[in-house]
UniProtKB/Swiss-Prot annotation, chain A:
Name this polypeptide is given: Beta-ketoacyl-[acyl-carrier-protein] synthase III 1
HAMAP family with a match to the protein in the record: FabH
NCBIfam families reported in the protein's UniProt record: fabH (TIGR00747), PRK09352.1 (NF006829)
Location of region: ACP-binding: 238-242
PANTHER family, per database record: 3-OXOACYL-[ACYL-CARRIER-PROTEIN] SYNTHASE, BETA-KETOACYL-[ACYL-CARRIER-PROTEIN] SYNTHASE III, CHLOROPLASTIC
Originating gene: fabHA
EC number: 2.3.1.180, 2.3.1.300
Organism: Bacillus subtilis (strain 168)
Curated annotation (Swiss-Prot), chain B:
Pfam families for the chain: PP-binding
Gene: acpA
Gene Ontology cellular-component terms listed: cytosol; membrane
Protein name: Acyl carrier protein
Family according to the record: Belongs to the acyl carrier protein (ACP) family.
Keyword tags: Cytoplasm, Fatty acid biosynthesis, Fatty acid metabolism, Lipid biosynthesis, Lipid metabolism, Phosphopantetheine, Phosphoprotein
Organism for this UniProt entry: Bacillus subtilis (strain 168)
GO biological process: lipid A biosynthetic process
Annotated ranges, domain Carrier: 2-77
PANTHER family registered for this protein in UniProt: ACYL CARRIER PROTEIN (PTHR20863), CARRIER DOMAIN-CONTAINING PROTEIN (PTHR20863:SF76)
GO MF: acyl binding; acyl carrier activity
Length: 312, 77
């Protein structure tokens, strides 16, 4: 049995916060933000919109595209560092709202690599024959844990949700290989402080990310028995264009074969990979049979990557 | 010295897209070679790979010119 992605969906808040808006909030400039991060604007969820609301919206789109009924879900995994509250989990909240009565539900905490952890976890249950349909959601309301007076981090983050239904696919499609990893010794470089603000040592995280993203991409390609030339499309975690470019260079891919949504949405942590996946599919950039590599990294430190042959 | 400078120069030319002639020992990465802070981090990473060494954050912050980089590498070897 092979596991693959049956359908995807996303939710993006309406409110746009541009670099020019940020210039009025902290000492920064549009030019500085663009050249250092590639970000031009990001979306911010309304005060009364929480992760569960965004997750449900994205999940409904994914279920519709997958043509899977909520009642047929066996498992719901929500990757988030910004749950509505510690418990009940976002996964339980959306289980109720979707009416997915049969599904077990748990949140996954692996920061920006959370969606990769979720997809790989779902894959295990599908390929063991235990479950048929696993809903994996990456959702974040990072605006709620951002220090809006810290110019180093306030410019980076955004809110949003992306979802995928993982299920059985034909033998010549689906997830070909994966890699998950963690390095707790780097935890000090990216964390939530006692004021619930995200703290980041930009230089250390940058170095880690550049090396790890490239490494993980190469590893999943090798594990899949493929070579760099076989990769049709790369979806890196949308943290910073400079980090993404480093991963792309490592794979020797042309610019048009890498997903870029960071300019519109900023870093949406666990949501960034599924949001990008939805947009690239809509733009017709990913076709049936294409080899797609997805790779994420985040606080923990954590990382995860998959190589997938797209299609059912 | 010549060998180290040559290898450092090649990395700088590749990474920053500058003319080899502009990569002088006294040239500052940020002021003369148009590098921003992330370019310098990337340069340091490439030097680490090229010369098989680890350059701590503290040391990296002191590397401002081409000469600083060359001296640092030679002192470590």
């Amino acid at each position: 049995m092979k596991a693959g992605i049956l359908g995807v969906g996303r939710y993006i808040p309406e409110k746009v916060l541009t670099n020019h808006d940020l210039e009025k909030m902290v000492e920064t400039s549009d030019e500085w933000i663009r050249t250092r991060t590639g970000i031009e604007e990001r979306r911010i969820a309304a005060d009364d919109v929480f992760s569960s609301h965004m997750a449900v919206a994205a999940a409904k789109n994914a279920l519709e595209q997958a043509e899977v009924a909520a009642e047929d879900l066996d498992m719901i995994l929500v990757a988030t560092v910004t749950p509505d509250q510690s418990f009940p989990t976002v996964s339980c909240m959306i289980q109720e709202q979707l009416g997915a009565k049969k599904a077990c539900a748990m949140d996954i905490s692996a920061a920006c690599a959370g969606f990769m952890y979720g997809v790989v976890t779902g894959k295990q249950f599908i390929e063991s024959g235990t479950y048929k349909h696993v809903l994996v959601v990456g959702v974040e309301k990072l605006s709620s844990i951002t220090d809006w007076e810290d110019r180093n981090t306030a410019v980076l983050f955004g809110d949003g949700a992306g979802a995928a239904v993982v299920g059985p696919v034909s033998d010549d499609r689906g997830i070909l290989s994966f890699e998950l990893g963690a390095d707790g010794t780097g935890g000090q470089h990216l964390y939530l402080n006692e004021k619930r603000h995200t703290i980041m040592n930009g230089r250390e995280v940058f170095k880690f990310a550049v090396r790890q993203m490239g490494e993980s991409c190469v590893n999943v390609i090798e594990k899949a028995g493929l070579s760099k030339e076989d990769v049709d499309f790369l979806i890196p975690h949308q943290a910073n264009i400079r980090i993404m470019e480093a991963a792309r260079e490592r794979l020797e891919l042309p610019v048009e074969k890498m997903s870029k949504t960071v300019h519109k949405y900023g870093n949406t942590s666990a949501a960034s990979i599924p949001i990008s996946l939805v947009e690239e599919l809509e733009a017709g950039k990913i076709k049936d049979g294409d080899v797609v590599v997805m790779v994420g990294f985040g606080g923990g430190l954590t990382w995860g990557a998959i190589a997938i042959r797209w299609g059912r | 010295m010549a060998d180290t400078l040559e290898r450092v120069t090649k990395i700088i030319v590749d990474r920053l897209g500058v003319d080899e002639a502009d990569v002088k020992l006294e040239a500052s990465f940020k002021e003369d070679l148009g590098a921003d802070s992330l370019d310098v981090v990337e340069l340091v990473m490439e030097l680490e790979d090229e010369f098989d060494m680890e350059i701590s954050d503290e040391d990296a912050e002191k590397i401002a010119t081409v000469g600083d980089a060359v001296n640092y590498i030679q002192n470590q070897q």
